[in-house]
Amino acid sequence: MNHLYRSFKTIALVGKPRNDINLQMHKNLFHWLMERGYQVLVEKEVAITLELPFEHLATLEEIGHRAQLAIVIGGDGNMLGRARVLAKYDIPLIGINRGNLGFLTDIDPKNAYSQLEACLERGEFFVEERFLLEAKIERASEIVSTSNAVNEAVIHPAKIAHMIDFHVYINDKFAFSQRSDGLIVSTPTGSTAYSLSAGGPILTPNLNAIALVPMFPHTLTSRPLVVDGDSKISIRFAEHNTSQLEVGCDSQITLPFTPDDVVHIQKSEHKLRLLHLKIIIITMC
């Protein structure tokens, strides 16, 4: 039993419903939690759509300050978007999978209420921490933009299918130069996402490691590189590159930059705290 469940007084429902079925689940779960005596906050846009009383509306930032648990209803994309914001508030998240793969969303919607009851009323869960990446754009010795990423930060040209030349430094030491369509810098969580499709290695979630995976490199010898998770990665660009470059964080946030800028990527100070169901396995002897 995890005694953390006793601290769950205010629970938030977050996620962006893609259809009426998902929207109805928000509504049903809202009433289910209210009937059990919890204070319930609902992400603002969803709460307005459901015409819930004003006191239950909250932005993600307000949820971070007020809730002790966030339930994400949707697929991994919903989890990624909410995790980037809520991680800095140290609030744990648990997901009900209404998407496709559900790598980060544990709960089966068909058994959602019984599984949530086990978590919320009997503490049958464990907490897993996963680190995020922080991407920063340096321009004329000043940081002009920044974003977190749960899965990966991808350096690429804004123009589709256009090669770029860049130099990678690890802990301020030159590592390699490359000419390719871009570079994927991935966490262990993201190693089974975009990084995997580019030939990157699969890393177990508890590894303290970062993978650097080239995207269509113009060479026969370029291979993915795995470095220590506490490494500080800097990428500098040749002047002749296209003037429009981007860092994409989890394919949801975009940081534009130019070849004169420097991209810095390292482990974020914030962590994603995921609640997972405890699975009891009975073996026959």
Curated annotation (Swiss-Prot):
Keywords for this protein: ATP-binding, Cytoplasm, Kinase, NAD, NADP, Nucleotide-binding, Transferase
Keyword ATP-binding: yes
Assigned EC number: 2.7.1.23
GO cellular component terms, semicolon-separated: cytoplasm
InterPro entries, A to Z: ATP-NAD_kinase_N, ATP-NAD_kinase_PpnK-typ_C, NAD/diacylglycerol_kinase_sf, NADK
GO MF, one example: NAD+ kinase activity
Catalysed reaction equations from the record: NAD(+) + ATP = ADP + NADP(+) + H(+)
Binding site for NAD(+): 76-77, 151-152, 162, 179, 181, 192-197, 252
Gene3D superfamilies recorded: Probable inorganic polyphosphate/atp-NAD kinase, domain 1 (3.40.50.10330), Probable inorganic polyphosphate/atp-NAD kinase, domain 2 (2.60.200.30)
Family indicated by similarity: Belongs to the NAD kinase family.
Name of this chain's protein: NAD kinase
Organism: Haemophilus influenzae (strain ATCC 51907 / DSM 11121 / KW20 / Rd)
Name of encoding gene: nadK
